[in-house]
Amino acid sequence: MGSSCLPPGFRFHPTDEELIEYYLKRKVEGLEIELEVIPVIDLYSFDPWELPDKSFLPNRDMEWYFFCSRDKKYPNGFRTNRGTKAGYWKATGKDRKITSRSSSIIGYRKTLVFYKGRAPLGDRSNWIMHEYRLCDDDTSQGSQNLKGAFVLCRVAMKNEIKTNTKIRKIPSEQTIGSGESSGLSSRVTSPSRDETMPFHSFANPVSTETDSSNIWISPEFILDSSKDYPQIQDVASQCFQQDFDFPIIGNQNMEFPASTSLDQNMDEFMQNGYWTNYGYDQTGLFGYSDFS
């Protein structure tokens, strides 16, 4: 039976319990399966990429099911020979117990991964396989000799590993132009650092000028120009009548020559670059030369 014999829209997605309880058990006991969708092949004679062409199911299902007889690695042993032409299947993890609705164990599922090359230096691939087998005590008298002769294998290829890169959204705390007259937003969070800084809105600039109408002055400090204040006048007169002696700093014998006129001095300065009564050194400093 091939995939062309399947009705349109047919999909084969059985559960682990259905695979063991119905398909594998009926195959081992020699009972008829209503729809033959699982072929019997020598699975380990093919590499995994050759198996889709051996399946009765459409390739678009991306899962392929096969009955396979156990090929013992050693005549008196229990290990299965799982080597192929280009590599080998390697078991990973522990066998999983498959239970029925009544919670009784009906079989086991083994997970295998295909490695390219020869053991133990093969390269791991994306091909995986689930191998189903019945329990050792789940037998009938008529199928005693057939017990363990078949296993059911589900082969699939994992998709490429997807890296789910989550972009962390940085909450923006800007509240520019919120309708308030202050012109200040709350705070702006920097996208590169965990720092915050105050932010001034250009739409509502903060004015540095002070409105004099908003300044409150106590009436006690307001003077009436129509009245006389003798206390203030006495204090002012005492300040102006007091003599202050300021010491003369530097050379007290220093005398400045009398200048003829401001125009003459200015003409002399424009011609020479300095007044003749002052000396000019290379440091760019002026020094008076007629000290007495």
UniProtKB/Swiss-Prot annotation:
Subcellular location: Nucleus
Highest taxon in the source lineage: Eukaryota
GO BP term, pick one: positive regulation of abscisic acid-activated signaling pathway
PROSITE patterns: NAC
Tissue: Expressed in roots, rosettes leaves, cauline leaves and stems.
Species, as recorded: Arabidopsis thaliana (Mouse-ear cress)
Domain comment, as recorded: The NAC domain includes a DNA binding domain and a dimerization domain.
Primary gene name: NAC096
Function: Transcriptional activator involved in the positive regulation of abscisic acid (ABA) responsive genes. Acts as a positive factor of ABA-mediated responses. Involved in the transcriptional activation of ABA-inducible genes in response to dehydration and osmotic stresses. Plays a positive role in both stomatal closure and water loss under dehydration stress conditions. Acts synergistically with ABF2 to activate the dehydration stress-response factor RD29A transcription. Binds to the consensus core cis-acting elements 5'-CGTA-3' and 5'-CACG-3' at the RD29A promoter.
Name of protein: NAC domain-containing protein 96
